[in-house]
């Protein structure tokens, strides 16, 4: 089996690590209309990403990493680590529109196999304001399947866990889709299981039954 977990709002209580970082770096007021413009069709996702990252140009990467490492995991995360230990033959992947540093934490702290996220360009220890790669807002499922194929990962079942509308494409590609602590914008389309609790322990209890 392959378990694919969204990160922001699923593994962490922070719905958006982008906004979390904007708040810390005091750039939230400059970016507050970007999402509105995107959802109104005035910006492409590539333009939205570029405009946000430009606000962090020349930020020391170690400062940026410390902010990301300050993001907590959800309550009950230790149960997921135990579940992952018991499922040692299965593949656990973190897939996020958030940053690779949070994906690295999922590998090191939660013992996931790998991650897919925003890979930031770094030059001389500072952010350049550009990204090397990132999942499209409406393309996480496509990105996940391509990752599995390119890494020759075979599986009998693909189980996906997410919380928001940008996880819908991922849900469409999965054998079992689970909405965990879902946002109010997420409808039941393409979702097999809804878990309104935000405690990871309750999610893990469901995973044991699948």
List each language-model region with its residue ranges:
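Short, mixed-charge, low-aromatic patches
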Residues: 4-11, 33-40, 57-60, 97-105, ...
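Short acidic/polar alpha-helix capping motifs at helix-coil junctions
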Residues: 14-15, 43-48, 63-70, 131-134, ...
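Residues that form generic nucleotide/phosphate-binding pockets
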Residues: 24, 34-37, 51, 55, ...
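Metal-dependent phosphoesterase signature
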Residues: 47-79
């Amino acid at each position: 089996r392959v378990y694919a977990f969204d990160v922001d709002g699923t593994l962490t209580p922070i719905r958006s690590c982008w906004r979390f970082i904007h708040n810390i770096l005091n750039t939230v007021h400059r970016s507050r209309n970007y999402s509105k413009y995107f959802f109104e069709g005035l910006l492409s996702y590539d333009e939205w990403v570029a405009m946000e990252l430009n606000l962090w140009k020349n930020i020391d990467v170690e400062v940026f990493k410390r902010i990301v490492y300050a993001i907590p995991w959800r309550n009950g995360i230790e149960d997921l680590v135990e579940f992952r230990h018991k499922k040692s033959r299965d593949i656990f992947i973190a897939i996020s529109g958030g940053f690779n540093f949070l994906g690295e934490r999922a590998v090191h702290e939660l013992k996931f196999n790998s991650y897919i996220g925003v890979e930031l360009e770094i030059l001389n220890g500072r952010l350049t304001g550009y990204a090397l790669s990132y999942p499209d807002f409406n393309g996480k499922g496509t990105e996940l399947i391509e990752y599995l194929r390119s890494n020759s990962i075979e599986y009998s079942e693909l189980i996906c866990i997410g919380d928001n509308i940008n996880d819908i494409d991922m849900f469409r590609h999965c054998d079992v889709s689970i909405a965990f602590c879902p946002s109010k914008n997420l409808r039941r389309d393409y979702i097999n299981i809804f878990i309104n609790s935000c405690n990871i322990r309750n999610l893990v209890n469901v995973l044991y039954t699948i």
